[in-house]
Amino acid sequence: MKSDNHSFLGDSPKAFILLGVSDRPWLELPLFVVLLLSYVLAMLGNVAIILASRVDPQLHSPMYIFLSHLSFLDLCYTTTTVPQMLVNMGSSQKTISYGGCTVQYAVFHWLGCTECIVLAAMALDRYVAICKPLHYAVLMHRALCQQLVALAWLSGFGNSFVQVVLTVQLPFCGRQVLNNFFCEVPAVIKLSCADTAVNDTILAVLVAFFVLVPLALILLSYGFIARAVLRIQSSKGRHKAFGTCSSHLMIVSLFYLPAIYMYLQPPSSYSQEQGKFISLFYSIITPTLNPFTYTLRNKDMKGALRRLLARIWRLCG
């Protein structure tokens, strides 16, 4: 192995420089404030949903089991990236250790893949609830929900494991500058001085499987849902069904479309400058919006949150 190459098999680079917006110093403070507020809102909102789903008996249905897992994923998702981003924006040393970078993209890909499958499971739940209401309790039983969630976590881990094993073996040469806010596999692969065709191909295949297949299931489920909703004679019933589903579709769009742009375009056309801003959609914007999207139009969740706040108030009083 050449002495100027660094890899998992030899000397690994000590650290990566995360460029972020350091080339635009005027943007760092406003972005720092936005990210900090978004992170606080994401933490508060998702913790509230998890607590309400756990302690309120009215929210022990499959829909809220999936929602509480989605909120937990979003908590972990934002905590994996945002604190590091905030530290770098407030410091002149915008670095992350090689080990820290590896852990970050490993966990990030694990959680991202898991969330793709959880969102598909939520679409399946809504399909059964609206299109097969008489069989809902039999089909969407608690054991099945737990199995789907376990499948999501295990699949996400498998995807992440493959990506990490392939990426840590790449040699890196020269100055290790990542034109991104945090470590992601496409950006790290871009720094390698070796031929990354195998990495690019496997990344595209895995992302296509774990992103496009769940997305196809979601769109198929909502196609059947739309057809069933249009048959509902009650305008109130149609409005309630569309309200629940539209919030889910908005989250799906904000999460999947940027991910597809980032991970499924040819490496030759991949723009790190555009990609680092697009990655903010699924790393912070979607996790921040999720609690509000799922509660503002959901009477059961709003009622549960009010009861939770009342209980906390009594305990504090």
Swiss-Prot record:
Extracellular side, ranges: 1-29, 84-104, 163-199, 264-276
Top-level taxon in the UniProt lineage: Eukaryota
UniProt KW keywords: Cell membrane, Disulfide bond, G-protein coupled receptor, Glycoprotein, Membrane, Olfaction, Receptor, Sensory transduction, Transducer, Transmembrane, Transmembrane helix
Residues bearing glycans: 5, 199
Keyword Transmembrane helix on entry: yes
Disulfide bonds, paired cysteine numbers: 101-193
Entry similarity comment: Belongs to the G-protein coupled receptor 1 family.
Name the UniProt record assigns to this protein: Olfactory receptor 2B11
